[in-house]
């Protein structure tokens, strides 16, 4: 399952993400991963959660990002949840590219039984309507 936390900058997306990470970490019988761009969430995320600063891995663009997510799922079958903050800063602000990325992530999440949640910094009206065929609103 793919979920999107959508809203403009300052609308509380990261707070929702942090709360969801905490809840998933407590409920999960496996591992929870949180991906961020930069070290902003270090003190907000539970220590049991695997916090990954994607800048340390040279990931730029949606193709590299998809490969990175595949590696996480392939490398550890116990991952139950992946949370991603600042999705558009990792991939790009091109909403068409975001749609194609989400189309690829959905089968990955289903095959690996992993819930993947992204924050997307924009108005929902800016996104292609088709994106909700592949992801649900958080």
Locate each region found by the language model:
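Conserved P-loop
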Residues: 1-73, 126-130, 135
């Amino acid at each position: 399952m793919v979920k999107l936390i959508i809203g403009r900058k300052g609308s509380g997306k990261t707070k929702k993400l942090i709360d969801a990470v905490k809840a998933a970490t407590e409920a999960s019988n496996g591992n929870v991963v949180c991906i961020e761009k930069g070290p902003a969430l270090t003190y907000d995320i539970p220590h049991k959660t695997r916090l990954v600063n994607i800048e340390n891995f040279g990931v730029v663009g949606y193709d590299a990002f998809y490969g990175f997510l595949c590696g996480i799922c392939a490398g550890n079958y116990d991952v139950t949840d992946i949370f991603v903050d600042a999705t558009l800063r990792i991939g790009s602000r091109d909403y068409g590219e975001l749609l194609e990325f989400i189309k690829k992530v959905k089968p990955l999440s289903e095959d690996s039984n992993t819930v993947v949640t992204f924050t997307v910094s924009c108005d929902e009206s800016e996104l292609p309507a088709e994106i909700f065929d592949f992801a649900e609103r958080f």
